[in-house]
């Protein structure tokens, strides 16, 4: 970018990111997350466009349809600010930020849904269930804290990379191999779900905790191995639940050897 070109100050960038945490607060059927996105980017537009008419025009172009995974949208927000700086410097046409958003929202929504919604969150939900059964509410607080720390760190990284790299953010996110990582997390999550089923059944039948813990570990290991060898996810999950309940019932009937 040329010398003396307008830049968004760090404070405004921080406000933009903070506002992005409320991206879905004004969700609507017509524009989906458009109002939340416009609200998030407004501090950057205020820093770039001193003229109210120009600022109003810039804000209006961000009121069009927008829908993405709320965590992955941080990368688009950062990249859009990157392009708005170029528009303010006269290096790009006003439509460039809109085209950037339209191009990335679909692919990043798919990546975000696959990693966060169908892999990371279910895994931590299962861990919270198992941890709460074994150790009580402190385990629930711990798992929630870790999950939120992970997604906040990733969101900050997405936002910074989008702002600094612009279009190159696509390559950076691709190198993270989130789809492959999501598959491994799903395998682990299925195993933990089987362990949770074993613990619930064991608790109901007053099986000693040591026996329940070993049964849960066995179910988790068997479920993970089955999935790693190509077994369908839903079959492995049902089998893990069945084995877990069966172990709990056998232990209840014949006593725990542990």
What are these regions (language model features)?
Residues 1-93:
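Soluble N-terminal domains of membrane-associated systems
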Residues 220-244:
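Interfacial loop-to-transmembrane junctions
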Residues 138-152:
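Alpha-helical transmembrane segments
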Residues 99-132:
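Transmembrane alpha-helical segments and their cytosolic interface motifs
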Residues 245-258:
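Juxtamembrane boundary at the C-terminal end of a transmembrane helix
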Residues 141, 200-216:
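Structural signature of hydrophobic alpha-helical transmembrane segments
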Residues 154-158, 175-206:
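Alpha-helical transmembrane segments of helical membrane proteins, especially in multi-pass transport
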Residues 96-98, 161-177:
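Juxtamembrane inter-helical linkers in multi-pass membrane proteins
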């Amino acid at each position: 970018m040329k010398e003396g070109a307008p830049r968004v100050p760090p404070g405004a960038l921080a406000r933009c990111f903070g506002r992005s945490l409320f991206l879905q607060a004004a969700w609507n059927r017509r524009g989906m997350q458009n109002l939340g996105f416009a609200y998030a980017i407004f501090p950057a537009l205020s820093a770039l466009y001193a003229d109210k008419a120009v600022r109003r025009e810039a804000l209006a172009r961000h009121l069009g349809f927008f829908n993405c995974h709320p965590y992955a949208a941080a990368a688009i927000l950062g990249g859009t600010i990157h392009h708005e700086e170029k528009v303010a410097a006269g290096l790009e046409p006003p439509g460039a930020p809109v085209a950037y958003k339209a191009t990335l929202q679909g692919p990043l929504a798919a990546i975000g849904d696959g990693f966060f919604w169908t892999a990371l969150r279910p895994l931590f939900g299962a861990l919270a269930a198992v941890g709460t059964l074994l150790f009580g509410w402190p385990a629930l607080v711990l798992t929630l804290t870790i999950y939120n720390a992970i997604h906040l760190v990733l969101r900050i990284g997405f936002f910074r990379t989008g702002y600094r790299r612009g279009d190159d953010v696509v390559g950076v996110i691709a190198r993270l191999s989130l789809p492959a990582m999501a598959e491994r997390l799903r395998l682990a999550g299925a195993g933990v779900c089987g362990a949770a089923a074993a613990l619930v059944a064991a608790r109901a039948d007053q099986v000693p905790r040591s026996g329940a813990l070993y049964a849960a570990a066995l179910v988790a290991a068997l479920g993970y191995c089955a999935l790693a060898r190509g077994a369908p996810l839903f079959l492995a999950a049902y089998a893990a639940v069945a084995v877990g309940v069966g172990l709990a019932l056998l232990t209840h009937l014949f006593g725990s050897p542990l």
